[in-house]
Structures are given as C-alpha cells and as structure tokens.
Amino acid sequence: MGSRLRFALLIALLGFVLLVWNLLSPVLSLLLSRRVGTRVGRHGIAFIFRGCWWVAERLGLMRIDAASLDALRDEPGGLIVAANHPTMLDALLVAARLPRGVCVMKAELLRNVFLGAGARFARYIRNDAGRGMLRDAVASLKEGGQLLLFPEGTRTVRWPVDAFKPGITLIAHLARVPIQTVLIESESPYLTKGWPLLRAPPFPVVIRLRLGKRFAHDPDHRAVLRALERYFASELVDERRAA
C-alpha cells in the first residue's frame, strides 16, 4: 500500500472516530454530572488521539517521541503546559499524553462538526472571551486541570519562535501555578502555517516533544514572559545546532 493511500486512510479513520465522538458527547453530557462528564470528555479526547498516533506510527507515516510528557499525567494540582507551535498537530500530540489537559481553542473550532461537541463536553476554553477566558482558565487550573497554551498565539512563522503574547504568565500568577515548558521539534513541513490538511508531506513525519524548564509564577508576570520567550528561542536554536 502506497504512502498516499495510507495517509488517506488515516485521515478518514480520524475523521470517522471524531465524528462518532462528537455525536456521543452531547448525549453523555446529559447523562453525566459536570465533574464526571468533564473527566470523561478529557480522557476521551486523549484516548482518541493517542490511538490515532499509534495507528499513524504503525502505518509508517509518523515517528513520534513524546514519552517524556507521561511524567505529567499523575502530577497533582494545576499546571500550565506551554509549548512552541510549529504545526497544527501540536495541540493534538500534547492532548494525547495529558488526560487532564484543557485546551484553549478558537471559537470557530468549538462549532466544528468534528471537534466542537467533544471540545465543549471536555469544557475546553474559548480564546475570544477576553476576561471570561482568563476567569475560566484560572478556575480550571484551581480544579486541577493541566492547561495547554501556546504563547505565540498561532503557528510559528519566524523560526525559532514568534513574539510571545501576554496572558500565559498572568494566568499562572492569578492561579498560582507553575509553567512547564514543552519543546516541539520537527523538520517536516506538514501543517505548518499555510500547509493544507489533505496535502501529503514526505513520510515519515518525525516529531519530538520533550519537557523543558519549569517556571514559577511571579507577580512580575511580564518579566516571566520575557524569560520564557528567551528560553524557548535559546533551546530551539541550541537543539538544531546539536542535531
């Protein structure tokens, strides 16, 4: 079976599974309490994407090294997980490893037929709600959630990282939780800015996710933001030089 056919099968399988989950999610949300439903919703998304990447690797389409993130699964208390954002796959790769993960999503994705109902069931957070987004993010962290944020705000255009947007370090300060960095490295162009979902890249797509430095929350959240941006830029440059 050629790589393009395997790629098409993977996309079709993922679309089918997500569609089924999005049909089930509204029903489950009516049957389960808020607390239990949120837990089921987040674990369900992690299970779906972990299975998807397992299939992708078995088909020879991807090689993923993300095992280091498993150390965060059972860590108690709230935590912000901050990652650079080279491709559209990043959130799905991290979510697969974090069953307590909470994503901040564009409003249009929360209306998407393949993602919306499942994301609402998991109580993911809209990124266009202003102070409401801050309030929801802090509340989720205080409930023990692991909040995934991309400080660049969108996929990287200028390597190694684009300028970081304010907000992540303010949320950490308000919730009094640390920021755990995750460095994502890939030389594949697939789903980088402007790359369409259905356009097949050279295979296999090789992606590595590794845990980086952890930053404490601080009242001077702007200084922490600057330090965070410098850290990501330095680590990604050093990693490429060492490769």
Language-model segments: residues:
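Catalytic core of membrane glycerolipid acyltransferases/transacylases, capturing the structured
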Residues: 25-50, 58-59, 74-129
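Glycine-rich phosphate-binding loop signature in dinucleotide/nucleotide-binding domains
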Residues: 73-76, 141-143
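Non-catalytic C-terminal accessory region of glycerolipid acyltransferases
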Residues: 4, 131-243
